[in-house]
Amino acid sequence: MKLAVIAKPYANAIFELAQQDNSHLQWKMVLDVGAYLLLDKKMRRLIASPNILEQDKLSTIKALLMSILNRELDAHEAMFISVLLDNNRIGILPSIATLFESLINITNNIKIFTIISSYQLSKSEKEQIVSDLMNQYNKTVSIDIVVDKDLVGGVIIKDGDKVIDISIKARVDELGLRLSKTH
């Protein structure tokens, strides 16, 4: 089963809770820090170890979260981490964080695109792309820029699974495909 399918009910539940008390930013921080902690090999080994008591795992995760966040976890946050551990779902925390952020963006009418370019775009080029995308989608737009030296020119615009490839490489590949079909 895909992680997103398992993570979605958790993300939705947290989002509903955050809607009630306007704690989106607080939850986003907890989820992002928790997801970050799971990048660490030692943390993943600790969680997977059958020799460490669940209570000790929970205490360690909570202590690390509080240390990084520089505050105590509230009752809902502590319970959430406990539920994930009890149900062997702590590993889906990165997926929950991603889905939660998507829910925030949908609610705030924000669309995030990944722009892949062969070079670092100038400020005016970024502004032009954002303006064009805002006009096309009628939403607030945020872009992440990725430089790919293998592109000859142009850009690739990614919106989730959708890809708009207006790179020279794509045009050359398309031309090559057409030529190969005619011979």
UniProtKB/Swiss-Prot annotation:
Keywords: ATP synthesis, Cell inner membrane, Cell membrane, CF(1), Hydrogen ion transport, Ion transport, Membrane, Transport. It holds the Pfam family OSCP. The keyword Nuclease does not apply. It is found in: Cell inner membrane. Gene3D superfamilies: N-terminal domain of the delta subunit of the F1F0-ATP synthase. GO terms for molecular function: proton-transporting ATP synthase activity, rotational mechanism. It is a peripheral membrane protein. One of its GO terms (cellular component) is proton-transporting ATP synthase complex. HAMAP family: ATP_synth_delta_bact. Belongs to the ATPase delta chain family. PANTHER family: ATP SYNTHASE DELTA CHAIN. F-type ATPases have 2 components, F(1) - the catalytic core - and F(0) - the membrane proton channel. F(1) has five subunits: alpha(3), beta(3), gamma(1), delta(1), epsilon(1). F(0) has three main subunits: a(1), b(2) and c(10-14). The alpha and beta chains form an alternating ring which encloses part of the gamma chain. F(1) is attached to F(0) by a central stalk formed by the gamma and epsilon chains, while a peripheral stalk is formed by the delta and b chains. This is ATP synthase subunit delta.
